[in-house]
């Protein structure tokens, strides 16, 4: 971390650190994970917290105050780290630090799938006032943003994917009621696992949605195999008569991947540092071509 970066982080800490008397002695370390270098571990005065800075041109759905409210509800159920402070004006979020692991390989383990399914079953019934996550709305938003970009020239493949996403989104919205408090961004980097339980971070895309949306996010964004997808369905729904079939989950996974692809394409145009987003779009594009 450069001196300029440290000065920027410390200035942000002065706005949210609970103990003004120790903030100048706080040790700061950049944390990995995610698409942007914006999270920092801050240790001092007997405290260990994570500071998250805003990203210019952010693609986040919720504002930081709404995100903090959603995360606090999850934390009250021990499903997320506690929110320590939020500064809506500066876009800052300070949360408790949990020394837990996350790796793409870890979320593929059978025991991890069991833990995450248990976590989602506990998260989804929580009564949190959040906007409804409509797939048709997000599809239209991303495609409209791209269409307004002078440098964007979609080929036949992207036009076909856009039509497919619109169709899948309409079907999903009309077929599955938004009954659950969904996280909607279940990349491995947003899932913390300690061997006994799983917890979630980064609730920027949280909203009311169908439980199947979170299952598709988890399976699609972490490249679950067919066997892992079936285990996820079995762990979440058990013997419920109305449980979706594997084909239903696979269609939702395809939809989530298409949405993430166009999200990445919009980010390429909007963000100044979008290399990771470009790589994501390219990776998802390769997966989509496989069917």
Q: Residue ranges of each PLM-predicted region?
A:
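Juxta-kinase regulatory segment immediately upstream of eukaryotic protein kinase catalytic domains
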Residues: 1-24
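A cross-family kinase active-site recognition segment
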Residues: 85, 101-162, 170-180, 205-209, ...
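Activation segment
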Residues: 56, 100, 198, 206-208, ...
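Active-site activation/catalytic loop segments of kinase-like enzymes and analogous catalytic loops
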Residues: 212-241, 254-272, 285-287
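ATP/Mg2+ or Mg2+-diphosphate-binding catalytic cores
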Residues: 149-159, 262-291
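All-alpha amphipathic helical-bundle segments outside canonical DNA-binding/catalytic cores
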Residues: 133, 242-254
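Active-site acidic catalytic loop and adjacent metal/ATP-binding pocket
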Residues: 30-46, 50-51, 166-213
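ATP-binding pocket architecture of kinase catalytic cores
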Residues: 29-136
